[in-house]
């Protein structure tokens, strides 16, 4: 009986681990990278003609907003090292955390290079999929909250658009006055 129980547990483990990964992606919200949709053919039918795009996006990938959690783990690991209670895995983890702290120093909350590329990729795909909407000197209005990573995301997005069409008429705004219409928080995100 124990053998059957163990077999059942081991059979279920891989499924539960995979199920857990889906849950992480589902509930991680803005901590996950932007998904890239490769096939947009299902977005509209052949008889439909796009005439307007309204893109409401979040900032791209960023550095963590603070080092508090990282510092707390580092303090615990350093205490364990001083007391000679750190395993070889712990030594490796401490080294990794020290390297991360140095790498992130002065970068907390800032948009990362990956975040810039995410924004540029969204703009590029939009222009490639709907070129008729971005021809000539069409007007593009862009707004962002006052948060630097959001402004930087908007600028990366717009820079890519200008690379494709330098005659675009871009109206760019930023500030706290846009928070009510742009800043949305959710328990699920």
Regions found by a protein language model. Name each.
Residues 60-63, 147-150, 177:
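Solvent-exposed loop/turn segments at secondary-structure junctions
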Residues 105-129, 142-144, 157:
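Loop-to-helix element that buttresses phosphate recognition and phosphoryl-transfer chemistry
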Residues 65-69, 153-156, 167:
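Short, solvent-exposed loop/turn and secondary-structure capping segments
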Residues 21-110, 121-125:
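N-terminal regions that are enriched for targeting/export leaders
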Residues 184-189:
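Conserved small/polar residues in nucleotide/adenosyl-binding loops
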Residues 46-50, 135, 150:
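Extracellular/periplasmic catalytic domains that process cell-envelope and extracellular macromolecules
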Residues 54-57, 139-146, 171-174:
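Extended hydrophobic secondary-structure segments that form protein cores and membrane-embedded regions
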Residues 1-22:
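Bacterial Sec-dependent N-terminal signal peptides
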């Amino acid at each position: 009986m124990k053998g059957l129980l163990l077999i059942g547990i081991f059979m279920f483990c891989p499924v539960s681990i995979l199920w857990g990964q889906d849950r992480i992606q589902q509930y991680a919200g803005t901590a996950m990278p932007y998904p890239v949709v490769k096939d947009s053919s299902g977005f509209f039918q052949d008889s439909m003609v796009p005439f307007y795009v309204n893109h409401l996006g979040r900032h791209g990938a960023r550095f963590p907003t603070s080092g508090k959690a990282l510092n707390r783990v580092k303090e615990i690991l350093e205490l364990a090292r001083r007391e000679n209670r750190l395993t070889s895995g712990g030594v490796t983890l401490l080294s990794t955390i020290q390297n991360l702290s140095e790498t992130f120093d002065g970068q907390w909350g800032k948009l990362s290079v990956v975040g810039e590329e995410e924004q540029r990729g969204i703009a590029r795909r939009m222009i490639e999929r709907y070129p008729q909407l971005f021809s000539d000197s069409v007007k593009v209005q862009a707004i962002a909250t006052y948060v630097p990573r959001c402004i930087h995301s908007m600028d990366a997005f717009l820079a890519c658009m200008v690379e494709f069409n330098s005659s675009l008429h871009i109206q760019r705004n930023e500030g706290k006055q846009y928070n009510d219409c742009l800043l949305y928080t959710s328990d699920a995100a």
